[in-house]
């Protein structure tokens, strides 16, 4: 779909002799640039691969039609690149495949029609998630900047998008790593002969504790709780010591030590940049697949496993008539692939200029979706086993959602398997590695953005800046480490970050497609890859993907989730608080627009035109090439 960008630039042929065209983002005609002086064939921006000539000048040589010319490099500051292509792929896969793939997708799938849910999920992936994923990779790879400074080359007035992304990343780091700390606490507790959540004889247990798998005959009542439930609620979270958000209680020193250890690992994994994090992900991104394979085989051999699989995949086609199913499918694929968080921009900016990001987008998206699907078998074979042992329906066993599905239901199932200690250790180690590489990615998005925006301050002080970021995240996590920390985690996840990142992604998609222009963007992709995106991608970027995001946002606003955790109903003021926290990030966008218009000289029309016109052309790093079909 051809659209006329609102900040369209003059094409080279429209510039008259000796006219200054550099302001419009193209080469001056007849006036040599510094890069021209550096040697023949070198270029200084990203808008031409053929030397331009002034009116009346004779072309130095003719280029045969339908051939591809390779253009030599320009000289600019060296930018770090990935050591290997697999470093990049594993980092992107590790970022996209996170804890949500393990607990959220299986739960949403069975709740929304089982196998029938795969249809809306696939449709939303093809028309919404994957196009946005591809767009961010291409933007980052072409412009080679983080999520703040990249907007100078796209549409400067929307630079506030980058600041909003950084604030959202801080909020996510404030609660996401607490979940990893819970998993670490479980891992440490697993190094015993008998897992502590198998018995009702511990100091934290109550009189209601009832062991399903006890040898003696037991009576289960409405007030009965399992050992795994009491271990999670009363020992790990200590949630019984909190009355709610109005009284969070004290900080758990055990969880505080766990999160300190988590952030220490994070610091030494990312402090040197992608050269170090690219090596760490060879472990953190591959280990979960080894564990998932082991757990899948083990689960398939358990009695009653087939009951869980049938419950997971049995299609209920009537569900597809409900709007909520399509909303859940759209939200799941968006948050699973993760466009709009600035991470894909940052990771792709360290690629070589002519790296095939189109292929990367397809491969990593398919791997992510397949991981979610396979994780459902890992979870539901075990839930089927639990239902068989309890002599209950699978729906009764699978009523837990979110982290509780992993830390209560799945943990209890593991505890009652043969070799339970071994399976507990590898399972919680898998959860930790899944969380770590997602955190690596989230913080790298912020670090790259700030270092690119303020290179004169932080370029040679990366280690110190990373330390500041890590300490800030630890301080931001303190509320989630209290007895009522789980309430804070849920509030931040549902209201403070979800709607905000959807809004940011929507604005980003509209700006790239309609202000920067889909024609210009596709031209950029062609320069990198040698081929232009087809009509399917153009239509998705211009219309379908923005509508996809708008659909999720409107559905959320019309039917906001009713927050309830365990037996606690969130007060109304907490919902307002959540919206305020979310708005605190998105508000950066209009604030920067106002600042830009006020600080730019000229009439209002001149200010607007200058503010939506790219400030600087994009250059390619030394050693890379552009591919232009002439």
Swiss-Prot record:
Binding sites annotated in the UniProt record for Na(+) 1: 94, 97, 434, 437-438
Coiled-coil features, chain-numbered ranges: none
Species of the source: Mus musculus
Database matches in Pfam families: 5HT_transport_N (PF03491), SNF (PF00209)
Extracellular side: 113-115, 187-252, 298-324, 381-421, 484-494, 559-574
Gene designation: Slc6a4
GO cellular component: a single term: plasma membrane
Family membership noted in the UniProt record: Belongs to the sodium:neurotransmitter symporter (SNF) (TC 2.A.22) family. SLC6A4 subfamily.
Induction data: Expressed in a circadian manner in the midbrain with a higher level expression seen during the dark phase (at protein level).
Membrane topology category: Multi-pass membrane protein
Keyword Glycoprotein listed: yes
Changes seen on gene knockout: Mutant mice are born at the expected Mendelian rate. Knockdown results in loss of serotonin uptake in synaptosomes of brainstem and cortex, abnormal barrel cortex development, enteric nervous system hyperplasia and reduced peristaltic reflexes.
One GO BP annotation of this record: response to hypoxia
Reactions it catalyzes: serotonin(out) + K(+)(in) + Na(+)(out) + H(+)(in) = serotonin(in) + K(+)(out) + Na(+)(in) + H(+)(out)
Tissue: Expressed in the lung, midbrain and brainstem regions. Expressed in brainstem raphe neurons.
Protein's name in the database: Sodium-dependent serotonin transporter
Quaternary context: Monomer or homooligomer. Interacts (via C-terminus) with SCAMP2; the interaction is direct and retains transporter molecules intracellularly. Interacts with filamentous actin and STX1A. Interacts (via the N-terminus) with STX1A (via the H3 domain); this interaction regulates SLC4A6 channel conductance. Interacts with SEC23A, SEC24C and PATJ. Interacts with NOS1; the interaction may diminish the cell surface localization of SERT in the brain and, correspondingly, reduce serotonin reuptake. Interacts with TGFB1I1. Interacts with ITGAV:ITGB3.
């Amino acid at each position: 779909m051809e659209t006329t960008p609102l900040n369209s630039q003059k094409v080279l042929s429209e510039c008259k002799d000796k006219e200054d065209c550099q302001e419009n983002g193209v080469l001056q005609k007849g006036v040599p640039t510094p890069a021209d002086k550096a040697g023949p064939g070198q270029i200084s921006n990203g808008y031409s691969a053929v030397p331009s000539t002034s009116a009346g000048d004779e072309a130095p040589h003719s280029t045969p039609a339908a051939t591809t010319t390779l253009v030599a490099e320009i000289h600019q500051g060296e930018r770090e690149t990935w050591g290997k292509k697999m470093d990049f792929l594993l980092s992107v896969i590790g970022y996209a495949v996170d804890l949500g793939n393990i607990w959220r997708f299986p739960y949403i799938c069975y709740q929304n029609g089982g196998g029938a849910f795969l249809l809306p999920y696939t449709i939303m992936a093809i028309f919404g998630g994957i196009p946005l994923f591809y767009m961010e990779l291409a933007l980052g790879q072409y412009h080679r900047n983080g999520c703040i400074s990249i907007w100078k080359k796209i549409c400067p007035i929307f630079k506030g998008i980058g600041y909003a992304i950084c604030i959202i990343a801080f909020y996510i780091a404030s609660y996401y790593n607490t979940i990893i700390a819970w998993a670490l606490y479980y891992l440490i507790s697993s190094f015993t002969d008998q897992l502590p959540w198998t018995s009702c004889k511990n100091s934290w247990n109550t009189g209601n504790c009832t062991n399903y798998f006890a040898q003696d005959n037991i009576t289960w009542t409405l007030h009965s709780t399992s050992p795994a439930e009491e271990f999670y609620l009363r020992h790990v979270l200590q949630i019984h010591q909190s009355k709610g958000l109005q009284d969070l209680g004290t900080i758990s020193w055990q969880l505080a030590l766990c999160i300190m250890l988590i952030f220490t690992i994070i610091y030494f994994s990312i402090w040197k940049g992608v050269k170090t994090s690219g090596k760490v992900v060879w472990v953190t991104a591959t280990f979960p697949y080894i564990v998932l394979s082991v757990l899948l085989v083990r689960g398939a051999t358990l009695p009653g496993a087939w009951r869980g699989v049938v419950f997971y995949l049995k299609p209920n086609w009537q569900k597809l008539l409900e709007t909520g199913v399509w909303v859940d499918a759209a939200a799941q694929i968006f948050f699973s692939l993760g466009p709009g968080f600035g991470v894909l921009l940052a990771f792709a900016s360290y690629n070589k200029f002519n790296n095939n990001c189109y292929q990367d987008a397809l491969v990593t998206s398919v791997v992510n979706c397949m991981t979610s699907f396979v994780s459902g078998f890992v979870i539901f074979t075990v839930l089927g086993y639990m239902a068989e042992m309890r002599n209950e329906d699978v729906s009764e066993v699978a009523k837990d959602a979110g982290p509780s599905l992993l830390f209560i239901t799945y943990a209890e199932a593991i505890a009652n398997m043969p070799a339970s200690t071994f399976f507990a250790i590898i399972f919680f180690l898998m959860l930790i590695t899944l969380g770590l590489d997602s955190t690596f990615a989230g913080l790298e998005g912020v670090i790259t953005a700030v270092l690119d925006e303020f290179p004169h301050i932080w370029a040679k002080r990366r280690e110190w800046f990373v330390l500041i970021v890590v300490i800030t995240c630890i301080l931001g996590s303190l509320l989630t480490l209290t007895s009522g920390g789980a309430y804070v985690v849920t509030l931040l996840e549902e209201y403070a970050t979800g709607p905000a990142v959807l809004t940011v992604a929507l604005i980003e998609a509209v700006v790239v497609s309609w202000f920067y222009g889909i024609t210009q963007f596709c031209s950029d992709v062609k320069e990198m890859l040698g081929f232009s995106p087809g009509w399917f991608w153009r239509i998705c970027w211009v219309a379908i993907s923005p509508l996809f995001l708008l659909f999720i946002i409107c559905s959320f606003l019309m039917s906001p989730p009713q927050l309830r955790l365990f037996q606690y109903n969130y007060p109304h003021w907490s919902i307002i608080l959540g919206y305020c926290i979310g708005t605190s990030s998105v508000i950066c966008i209009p604030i920067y627009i106002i600042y830009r218009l006020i600080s730019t000289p000229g009439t209002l029309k001149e200010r607007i035109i200058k503010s939506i016109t790219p400030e600087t052309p994009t250059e390619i790093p030394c050693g890379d090439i552009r591919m232009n079909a002439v």
